Amino acid sequence: MGAKEVKPTRSELIELKKKIKLSEGGHKLLKMKRDGLILEFFDILSKAKDVRSELDAAYEKANVKIGIAESVEGRITIKSTAFAMKDAPQIVLESHNIMGVVVPKIESSSVRKPINKRGYGLLGTSSYIDEAVDSYEELVEKIILAAEIETTMKKLLDDIEKTKRRVNALEFKVIPELTEAMVFIRLRLEEMERENTFRLKRIKKA
């Protein structure tokens, strides 16, 4: 809105004051939201670093355990045990709200199973296979948790950028333009008032 595009009337001046007040209120709320989202992001980033370290450790552990199991039991036994495993883990995708941003919550409590619920026979298999399965169940849990956290971080980053753009638009474009238009109308009304006063004085003198 250019200053010269507005009508220099008192009603327009009142309307502009309302718009400025509303824009300033919105600007304040958006800044609070942006700052809150940034704090949330860095809090989750700290957790993400821990989870990433845990994921790397779980991956290394799983590789070691499966290597030991293969060397003791043989690859064929490991494969037949894997094929005997029953029921893929139930993954339930839910969501929750962080300052207006909907982020995923993945429920994966069924990943870890008791030994007697895994599907392969307990007789004829050693504890090395059980340990390998344990380590891979742990790895899957870490992968799911890492996916949840990284998706949350991406969504928060997207919303932080969107909120920053809105804050900047209000701060550097909308509010300055409205203020400029308000000042223009004020000055124009004062000028018109002086002209009217001068005109009335001339009429009285005449």
From Swiss-Prot:
Membrane-spanning residues: none
One GO cellular component term noted in the UniProt record for this chain: plasma membrane
Pfam families: ATP-synt_D
Signal peptide location: none
Principal location class: membrane
UniProt topology in membrane: Peripheral membrane protein
Keywords of this entry: ATP synthesis, Cell membrane, Hydrogen ion transport, Ion transport, Membrane, Transport
Family membership: Belongs to the V-ATPase D subunit family.
Subunit structure of this chain's protein: Has multiple subunits with at least A(3), B(3), C, D, E, F, H, I and proteolipid K(x).
PANTHER family named among the record's database cross-references: V-TYPE ATP SYNTHASE SUBUNIT D
HAMAP family (alphabetical): ATP_synth_D_arch
Name listed for the protein in its UniProt record: A-type ATP synthase subunit D
Taxonomic placement: Archaea, Methanobacteriati, Methanobacteriota, Stenosarchaea group, Methanomicrobia
